[in-house]
Every structure is written in structure tokens, then in C-alpha cells.
Regions:
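Walker A/P-loop
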Residues: 110-132
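Conserved Walker A/P-loop ATP-binding site and its immediately adjacent core
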Residues: 124-126, 133-160, 332-334
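Conserved helix-turn-beta segment of the N-terminal RecA-like "Helicase ATP-binding" lobe
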Residues: 148-173, 346
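Conserved helicase ATPase core of P-loop NTP-dependent helicases/translocases
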Residues: 168-170, 174-176, 327, 337-338, ...
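A short beta-strand element within the Helicase C-terminal
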Residues: 196-197, 378, 385-400, 423-427
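Post-DEXD/H (motif II) to motif III coupling segment of the RecA-like Helicase ATP-binding lobe
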Residues: 205-270, 447
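Conserved interdomain hinge at the start of the Helicase C-terminal
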Residues: 290-331, 338-342
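Conserved segment of the helicase C-terminal RecA-like domain
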Residues: 413-444
Length: 482
């Protein structure tokens, strides 16, 4: 049997009947679950698909990153592109922490792989160090999620360690050529993707998205393929296999517990606020779970929920009086706008700002928040993807959902360590709808799995007094200890 290793797919060409039988047997043994929409039944159904596909020419093929599932290793064809000594002699090596050096060296032994590193571990520095280890004649593509503010933040850091002519960027209307091309995921089609011999993907949990997936499939000359994320997998079976297939397996992990023990992350006090709304109860809506009409649940129990909004406003009163800042994470623009209006009416106009993925000048707004120009930042999913907010010390998760990726990305925005800093996180256990309640349960499960502890607080009676008691007995006392 012939095996043709390529940077995207590995092909298996049977030369006789025995080879065909071996490959057919392999194909049956590497099967995964996949959700597919059934237009007749109008719902998603579980189907089983094989990782080892067959084309019309009876040639079998698999994404090269999935070779370990066939008990095979991808050849180390990247070694001629790597110079470890060059990295160790560079000034950036001295700035790296011990766990960063360990992760980088282990990753560089392989032509492809992922570093699973919790938020606040310095993934951008690891990416820069790997670029230093790659020889100077090798063109590198760095893929950044779609938000311009995140790309600008990355470019700014790179220019501290690389010469200006080395660094290029590609986003929106902005373009500059360079050996190290930092590109927004939405602008990849503008590039000649075959040109790059190394591809590094930040926030690689986004790889299954069509724009990034198609781009990585077109990077046929990229012998080096690395991914970085605090939550690289955990979407679904099918999407996880796409990520691994295009970038390789997780090679190294940097956990919250490791950073906490070494003092490289902020301590976290996580509260889950258990409540039931006092202004309405609808048995039909409690049992409601039709995803097509899901907006009704969101509007009733999130957007129009006066009790939930009151809890947020009471928390903000103590947060502001304690001279702390706060990030409020929302899922929908209308929720963010509504909270912004409520906060301005209850406090003052200049204390809060709302930003979303389509808000102009997001980077400037985040810098102003970080410098203390205003105290409360309300943001949508933009804030989940690597935005650097080192001074953030309080988070209110006003959104819903059960995704481990989203939850950990949100917490991660406040994990940047500072002397005397304690990160307070407030989450909700919504008891008015069974699906929302299930979402809360899933979030608690993910917290425990990732090494975070939490405390449940019941808010069933006098909201104002109970929030006051929570703040002075559980929050302020903890802050004094730090």
C-alpha cells in the first residue's frame, strides 16, 4: 500500500485486494458521531461518519492531523525549518516563564499540534517565540479571529520584538506586506495561501468556521501547523475532529491550577446567584424548549426580567462604591443597549459604555476602560476572544448558554495577574425556565472540570438586603485578604 503524506490530507492507495480490506476495516473502526439536519423531520439527527474517507478512485484519505487515530505518526518534515538555538539566543527567551518554555519546546518537536493554555498564560508571547524559532527565510501566516481590535493588539505586541519590515497585516482596508503576516480570519481570501510554509492559528477553537477551515485546506505548503487556545476543543465531536485534523492533537496543557500555584494568575471568587423572578411565573414557558421560538424565552426571562436587572444594578452599586470596575457580558445587542440605558438612568452617563462586534473604535474603548476613564464595560462575544484587559477585577455574566468555551473565555478576561487583585465573578442560575436552568447546571459542571470553585448564593427574598449581605460578608472580606 502506498502512503502519500501531504500537509493537508494523507492518502492511502491500495495496491491489492488485501490493502483494500485493511483500509475498509480501518474505515469502519474510526467512526464519529455527527449531527445533521433532517429537512423532512425538521430536526437534527445523529449520524455516524468515518474519519477515513474514500474517493471515486478507491483512494482513501484522512486529514493529516487525524493520523494518530489510525495509530500512525505524521513524519517530522518540519525540522529543516526550525532553529531552536536561534530562539534561545533571542531576547524574547529571557522574558518567557518556565511553563511557556516547556510548552514551546514540546510543540516545536512536532510539525503540528495545539497548546491548550488557560487565558492569561501569555499565548501571544508563545506565538512570538515560535516565530523566532522558525528560520528567517520561512514565510509565516498568523490567523487571528475576525475582530480588528484583537488584530491591532497582536500587531502592537509583535512590533516590540520584531523589526517593522518583518511584520505584515491584513484586515479590512488595512494591508501591509511582511514575512510574518498577521491576518484577520475574514480577510484570508485576499492572500496567496500556498505561499506560507508555517501557519499559526490563535483562538483555534474557531478553526471549524468555514473561512478558517477553507483557508487551512488551501495552505498546502504549510509544513508547520500550530494552534493556540484556552479552549481548543469542546464544541461538538465533528467540529473537534476538524480542528485536530487541520492542526494536530493537543501537545501541551497549561492549566489554571498550574498558574495559580505559581502566582501567574489572579485568584477568583465565583458566585452563582440562585433566584426566581417575583414579577411573573408561567408554567408553559418554564417547560418551553422549542429552539425555533427560543427568542421568546430569551425576551421573557432575560431581556424583560426585572428581577435579573435589579440584581445587576444592586451589584453595580457596591462595585462602584468599592472603586472597582466591571465587565458585563451579554449575548444580544438589545440586552446590552437596555442595560446601558438602565445604568445611565440609575448612576450617571459617563460611567458605562457598550461595545459590540460592529462598534467602531472598540480597541480605544477597551483602553479607556483599562485606564479607568469609565467603570462599567458592557460587551458581546467580542470580549470572549483574547482581548487584553489586565485591570479588570469584576465580571457579571448576564448572558446565557452552556458552552464551556464561551464560559472560560469570559472568565479569562479577568485572569491577568496584578498585585492585590481578586477577580470577582457573578453568574446566574435562572430558575424560571428548565432549559436556562440546564444551562446553569452545565456551566457549573465546566467550572469544576477546569479547576474553578464556586459558591451558590440564594436571592429569593429582599434582593437589596441580600446583595448587601453578599457584598459585605463574602466579597469585601475576601478583598481585604488580598
Amino acid at each position: 500500500m502506498k502512503v502519500d503524506y501531504t500537509n493537508v490530507y494523507t492518502f492511502f492507495i491500495p495496491e491489492n485486494q488485501k490493502d483494500k480490506e485493511i483500509l475498509e476495516n480501518l474505515s469502519k473502526n474510526v467512526v464519529i458521531r455527527k449531527l445533521e439536519y433532517n429537512p423532512i423531520l425538521k430536526r437534527k439527527e445523529i449520524k455516524y461518519v468515518t474519519l477515513l474517507q474514500k474517493n471515486r478512485n478507491n483512494t482513501y484519505y484522512i486529514l493529516s492531523g487525524l493520523l494518530p487515530y489510525l495509530k500512525m505518526k505524521y513524519p517530522k518534515i518540519h525540522t529543516s525549518l526550525i532553529d531552536i538555538e536561534k530562539l534561545k539566543n533571542d531576547s524574547i527567551w529571557q522574558t518567557l516563564r518556565d511553563y511557556q518554555k516547556r510548552a514551546i519546546l514540546n510543540l516545536l518537536e512536532q510539525p503540528r499540534g495545539i497548546i491548550d493554555a488557560i487565558m492569561g498564560s501569555g499565548k501571544t508571547y508563545m506565538i512570538m517565540a515560535i516565530c523566532k524559532a522558525i528560520k528567517e527565510n520561512v514565510p509565516i501566516l498568523i490567523i487571528i479571529p475576525k475582530y480588528q481590535a484583537l488584530l491591532e493588539q497582536t500587531v502592537k505586541k509583535f512590533l516590540e520584538f520584531f523589526k517593522k519590515y518583518e511584520i505584515g497585516w491584513n484586515y479590512g482596508k488595512g494591508y501591509k506586506n511582511g514575512r510574518i503576516m498577521i491576518s484577520s480570519s475574514t480577510c484570508l481570501e485576499k492572500l496567496s495561501l500556498n505561499y506560507y510554509k508555517a501557519v499559526l492559528t490563535d483562538e483555534c477553537q474557531s478553526v471549524p468556521a468555514n473561512t478558517i477551515k477553507k483557508a487551512l485546506l488551501k495552505c498546502k505548503n504549510a509544513a508547520i501547523r500550530y494552534g493556540f487556545s484556552g479552549t481548543p476543543i469542546g464544541r461538538s465531536d465533528q467540529n473537534d475532529y476538524i480542528t485536530i485534523g487541520l492542526l494536530g492533537n493537543i501537545i501541551e496543557k497549561v492549566t489554571y491550577q498550574e498558574l495559580k500555584e505559581k502566582g501567574f494568575t489572579s485568584p477568583v471568587k465565583y458566585f452563582i446567584l440562585k433566584y426566581n423572578s417575583t414579577d411573573f411565573y408561567d408554567k408553559d414557558l418554564f417547560l418551553y424548549s422549542d429552539t425555533k421560538e427560543w427568542h421568546k424565552v430569551v425576551e421573557k426571562f432575560i431581556l424583560e426580567n426585572k428581577t435579573r436587572t435589579k440584581i445587576i444594578l444592586e451589584l453595580l452599586k457596591h462595585i462602584i462604591n468599592s472603586n472597582r470596575n466591571c465587565l458585563i457580558v451579554v449575548e444580544r445587542k438589545e440586552h446590552g443597549k437596555k442595560l446601558e440605558k438602565e445604568i445611565k438612568e440609575n448612576f450617571n452617563e459617563n460611567i458605562v459604555k457598550y461595545i459590540s462586534s460592529d462598534t467602531k473604535h472598540n480597541f480605544r474603548a477597551i483602553q479607556e476602560f483599562n485606564s479607568g476613564k469609565f467603570k462599567i464595560l458592557i460587551a458581546t462575544q467580542l470580549i470572549e476572544l483574547g482581548m487584553d484587559i489586565p485591570n479588570l477585577n469584576t465580571i457579571i455574566i448576564a448572558s446565557i448558554g452552556k458552552s464551556s468555551i464561551q464560559l472560560l473565555q469570559r472568565i479569562g478576561r479577568g485572569l491577568r495577574p496584578q498585585e492585590g487583585k481578586l477577580l470577582l465573578v457573578f453568574d446566574f442560575q435562572d430558575g424560571d425556565n428548565n432549559v436556562l436552568y440546564h444551562h446553569s447546571y452545565q456551566r457549573k459542571k465546566w467550572l469544576m472540570q477546569k479547576g474553578f470553585s464556586y459558591e451558590e448564593v440564594i436571592l429569593y427574598r429582599d434582593i437589596e438586603k441580600e446583595i448587601e449581605r453578599l457584598w459585605f460578608e463574602k466579597c469585601q472580606n475576601q478583598m481585604i485578604n488580598y
